[in-house]
Amino acid sequence: MSKLAVVAAGGTGGHMFPAQALAEALAARGWRVVLATDDRGALYADKFPAEERLALSAATAKSNDPLGMIKAGFVVLQGVMEARAAFKRLDPAVVVGFGGYPALPALLGALSQGRPTVIHEQNAVLGRVNRFLAPRVNEVACAFPILEKATPAVKACAHVVGNPVRPPVRALFDVPYLAPEVQLRVLVTGGSQGARLLSELIPEAVAKLPEEMRGRLKVFQQARAESMEQARKVYRNAMVECEVAPFFRDMAGYLRQSHLVIGRSGASTCTELAVAGRPSILIPLKIAADDHQRFNARLLEEAGGAAVCLEDELTVDVMAAALKALLSKPERLEKMAAGARSAAKPNAAEELADLVEKTAR
């Protein structure tokens, strides 16, 4: 019988999409895959190639909430016991965690049974759960050449494999960027959770662009449900063609069409922009844990692939000026596209799968 890997991820698309890409790579090599996730992660798992899903108890709490931390500890302990029972039945050859509190019970359960373990950090800053697990697991993989908040020992042994992306996005690495000639296509994405700031600010900024530029624009706007109608109204009044939706499932298709992307700088967003070779304006989420989105954005900015606007400095006028400066210079967009692609690691899923196979028993 083929070997089985448990992939533990959940919480957001930022954890789930790389986990799915690894699962697909392992499945293509003949592995069986079981997904350990939570209710939120299940929302992104409709195409996850898993023969079974484990819903393990998991919880988190703020460090300044002692009672909440105690309660969360008991919930995690319950999840660990659930994981141990499931692993005794499944006997996985390896357990792979993608960070976030939903992955913790599975990894602790595996460690308590002496099973091979691998963790992957998607961001340029080692997350809290992975920070705890890193000294204890067999192998640490990471997406970026910098890994803030990691100890020197962890940094020294970490494998820089990149962030796994799904095959449709990986295919864009081989598609050349075509600078705009007539129509200007802009994709606005707030990440898998949407972004109120972008839902409301970007349409207003677009409305301030010169009439000639607005007449050439087509905007694909991801917006929160409560902001969609207002966004459509602003675009309509500005005579801008638009497509507004709460979530774009075919992200590869929209990336392929777009000349410029505006979005947050979560790990998946930055990785997909690099692999697709798309220029971008990035707005790091100010409240992101350990300011990890700013570190993610910096890597694309230093490669020449992105312009970065900090939330505290962002206004409608600032965004309008940034849009005008980029959309009026196709040659600059082409140069940024090349810069973004220079930061890509398109074979991350295969490299991580190699590491997982090497670690498995």
Curated annotation (Swiss-Prot):
It catalyses: di-trans,octa-cis-undecaprenyl diphospho-N-acetyl-alpha-D-muramoyl-L-alanyl-D-glutamyl-meso-2,6-diaminopimeloyl-D-alanyl-D-alanine + UDP-N-acetyl-alpha-D-glucosamine = di-trans,octa-cis-undecaprenyl diphospho-[N-acetyl-alpha-D-glucosaminyl-(1->4)]-N-acetyl-alpha-D-muramoyl-L-alanyl-D-glutamyl-meso-2,6-diaminopimeloyl-D-alanyl-D-alanine + UDP + H(+). Its EC number is 2.4.1.227. It is an enzyme of class 2 (transferase). It comes from the Bacteria. Disulfide bonds: none annotated. Pathway: Cell wall biogenesis; peptidoglycan biosynthesis. It is found in: Cell inner membrane. One of its GO terms (cellular component) is plasma membrane. Pfam families: Glyco_tran_28_C (PF04101), Glyco_transf_28 (PF03033). It is a peripheral membrane protein. One of its GO terms (biological process) is carbohydrate metabolic process. GO terms for molecular function: UDP-N-acetyl-D-glucosamine:N-acetylmuramoyl-L-alanyl-D-glutamyl-meso-2,6-diaminopimelyl-D-alanyl-D-alanine-diphosphoundecaprenol 4-beta-N-acetylglucosaminlytransferase activity; undecaprenyldiphospho-muramoylpentapeptide beta-N-acetylglucosaminyltransferase activity. UDP-N-acetyl-alpha-D-glucosamine binds at T12, G13, G14, N123, R166, S192, Q293. Cell wall formation. Catalyzes the transfer of a GlcNAc subunit on undecaprenyl-pyrophosphoryl-MurNAc-pentapeptide (lipid intermediate I) to form undecaprenyl-pyrophosphoryl-MurNAc-(pentapeptide)GlcNAc (lipid intermediate II). HAMAP family: MurG. Belongs to the glycosyltransferase 28 family. MurG subfamily. This is UDP-N-acetylglucosamine--N-acetylmuramyl-(pentapeptide) pyrophosphoryl-undecaprenol N-acetylglucosamine transferase. It comes from Caulobacter vibrioides (strain NA1000 / CB15N).
